[in-house]
Amino acid sequence: MADYQNILTPCRFAPKPHHGVELPRGNWAEKARPIFVWLLGKIGDASSDHPPGVAGTVSAVLFAFAFLIIGANFLASVDWNPIEFIRLLPWLALEPPRPNWAWVLAPMNEGGWWQITGFFLTMSLLVWWWHVYNRARALGLGTHMAWAFASALFLYLTLGFIRPLLLGNWGEAVPFGLFAHLDWTAAFSLRYGNLYYNPFHMLSIAFLYGSAVLFAMHGATILAVSHLGGDREVEQITDRGTAAERAALFWRWTMG
């Protein structure tokens, strides 16, 4: 029986853990022992073979701090009522300090919690970027994912740090909250002209969603031929008669 499974396979079993690409001696991840998690197996016999490492763990902890602070502030705003928390969740927000506080650390209930949350969230994202970059280098892969993530980080830092820095106060930054950040976006659009008529905004959205669809098409196609070994044909992806070639033919014929 094959020991390779994916998210579409119905059978479940416990094979020996696969350690992946051999890492250089002395690498921290080399000494970690892979573990199997039964609950993760519910979505395709998944296992946490890949240890998060120091950077991944630090990033997760920092993100958890930011997430918990936002959640606690949301709960406090509805007087710690869980029913109201669920009912009003889309409208709840953690707002940045008012403009009069400029760049100083504001009191907790007047934007201080937002500043602390922003610090933890920003550090989490930066450390996770380092994790992605470092893992790619350690495994001998390209760093394309890290630089793609860096472009999203640049937008995040521009709206949450660089632009407020240039304008002189934290009040120009984006609030945390579903409708709150959408309202901020609408106000930003009205302030600087309608973004929907901005050609650069049009191009960025087209490339954003276009690349997302292309990545989804690629991932779904390779997953569909994984039972034929298509996901393991990295070096043979252009050879004739392979599963990856059949997948490529599908899209070639689809596009005429």
Curated annotation (Swiss-Prot):
InterPro entries given in the database record: Photo_II_D1/D2_sf, Photo_RC_L/M, Photo_RC_L/M_CS, Photo_RC_M
Disulfide-bonded cysteines: none
Family: Belongs to the reaction center PufL/M/PsbA/D family.
GO cellular component, one term: plasma membrane-derived chromatophore membrane
Gene, per the UniProt record: pufM
Keywords (A to Z) from UniProt: Bacteriochlorophyll, Chlorophyll, Chromophore, Electron transport, Iron, Magnesium, Membrane, Metal-binding, Photosynthesis, Reaction center, Transmembrane, Transmembrane helix, Transport
Quaternary assembly: Reaction center is composed of four bacteriochlorophylls, two bacteriopheophytins, two ubiquinones, one iron, and two highly hydrophobic polypeptide chains (designated L and M).
GO molecular function, one term: bacteriochlorophyll binding
Binding site for Fe cation: H218, E233
Pfam annotation, one family: Photo_RC
Transmembrane segments: 52-78, 110-139, 142-167, 197-225
Listed name of the protein: Reaction center protein M chain
Major location (coarse): membrane
Native organism: Pararhodospirillum photometricum (Rhodospirillum photometricum)
Compartment(s): Cellular chromatophore membrane
UniProt record, GO biological process: photosynthetic electron transport in photosystem II
Binding site for a ubiquinone: W251
Task of the protein: The reaction center is a membrane-bound complex that mediates the initial photochemical event in the electron transfer process of photosynthesis.
Membrane topology: Multi-pass membrane protein
Residues holding (7R,8Z)-bacteriochlorophyll b: H181, H201
